[in-house]
Amino acid sequence: MSSQVYPKDKEILPGLHLEKVDDRIMTLNVGPQHPGSGHMRIILKVDGDYIVHCDPDPGYVHRGEEKMAEYRNYITNIPHLERPVIHDSCNILYPYCLGVEELLGLEVPERAKYIRVIASELNRCVYTQYWLAIYGIFLGHSTMFMWPMGDRELMIDLLDKMTGARVTHAYFVPGGIRNDIPPNFEDVCLRQVNYFEKRLKEYADVFYDNPILISRTKDTGILSREDAIKLGTTGSVLRASGVDFDIRKKEPYDVYEEMDFQTNVLKEGDSYARSKIPWLDMFESCRIIRDALKKMPKSGSVRVKLKPKPKGGDTEVYRRVESGRGSLGMYIVSRGLPQPYRLKISVPSFRNLIAMPHLLTGEKLGNMPAVYWSLNYWPVEADR
């Protein structure tokens, strides 16, 4: 090892300076490590085994989604807008379609509203199972990776039957959905959802009562109710800290007001509670899907016919939905053109990322993965 000591302001590379710190403090770069382009970096300062400072460094997968939307019309924006969260594509398109429908004064057919809700909840389960599987890797629990990755195929299969695509569906469009569901879909959907729910019940013994998960997540990264509200967290992170807030209940859209389900809330605020809320939410998704299948009109139109390149008025709208990670909103500014003048995407991942330094400071370094992924953070969505 070189014995050379650099002065505090010594420039090693353009824009890179070495900072003189206490001899006890070590700076660690966690990431970006990914077989693709790299997702995120977390800069940690540790004193022995304890984290004394955390500096998240997002932006490695920024693709300019908001700017891109200004150069495409309201319909051709759909395929690229779902890319930031490919495993929850229906829910990221949902607020966009609701906003454009408000701009254009469109009334969505009743049958399409129910099908949207079904697709949204199927996608929520697909995303949550993927998130849970990755959490298993973070915790060193291989079964927790394999089971969710296998069980999510039940929901992917249903979405494939509905939309013709396994992952990114481009299924929601302003004015309804792209196409109706196939014949006998209701029976297949009900059968697979019921089996999926039975599988979820087995997770309690194998995962949530498992000493591995409990020892890694209980009493780590505790976020109080007051701090959860103050930091602006959302979704499972907020509800794991005792705040009863779900947009499907508080600001219902389409036919969620008619659905029979409850909001899951826990008070512990630790990583264990944050890992459990999404699992409990999947049971409610199954309830919603069954209820929507029962109440859905058996026939009717599923899409409003639009003129090519429809134009909005000189106005602006904001619509938000409850995605698999929390509140996801779209702010659309229209100036009477076929494309948005401005599109701003408010994503839950970035809001929950704000809590990371608060939770990791003072924690042991070994607890970092468990706390980080419990925040339901999706790097690609945060960067947009």
Where are these regions (language model features)?
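Active-site bordering "gate/hinge" segments
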Residues: 1-342, 346-384
